[in-house]
Amino acid sequence: MTCDLAETSPGGPWYRIGRHPDPWVWPDWSYAGPDGTFGGRFDDPDSSYRVLYAASRPLGAYLETMAWARPDPAVDLDVIAISDPADEDDYAAGLIPRDWIDRRRLGRACAAGTLAAVGHSQSLSRLRGSTAGSMVAHGVAELDAAAIRETAPRAFTQDLGRLVYRCLAADGRTPAYDGIMYASKHGDDVECWALFEGRGDLTDTESLRIDPADSDLAEALRLLRVEIDWA
């Protein structure tokens, strides 16, 4: 089906926090949960493809992956790339141990592709009819920018992600979108990306050691109100 969603392309490099040695490795299917997904916002509910999450700035990557450590009573689990969700249960709220940092790297890569801007007014208008059944099933009253950002029900945004994945170009054969661009719950200024497996192009991938003096890391810690135990 054709979808006619608003689309965009990466205007610069992508960043993500992932496991050492290569933060750009696709998650291993053996780590998928009972529902067949990795818990990501736009993961495939049918477990036929994986999704890689990134941000336009290092700050966004830090915010998304360290949100689990916030001391808030209702911690936000809307993350890009927590490879081991069990970490959330292992560490004290408000404190990130050094070994968590040591086992991860800041990834940088050049990305190319056509991505659906699902929060755009045109996209929301086009998607309302197509997602009606899922909205009813998951108790979503209205498809708006807020619904896309909600942490739960995650199954709804995963249904939406699969719908975008199945959209076709005007020729009726070629996939229309390589992934999704969306705004983070941590702020309108935090631009995030979800890349579908087998789509788009990632080149010049880098794996960088996380620098304790990184200003983006410091800002993320300040905004999240968490600390790293460097001892």
What are these regions (language model features)?
Residues 1-39, 74-231:
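Active-site and NAD+-binding cores of ADP-ribose-processing enzymes
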Residues 40-73:
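Extended catalytic/binding region for NAD+/ADP-ribose chemistry, centered on the ART fold
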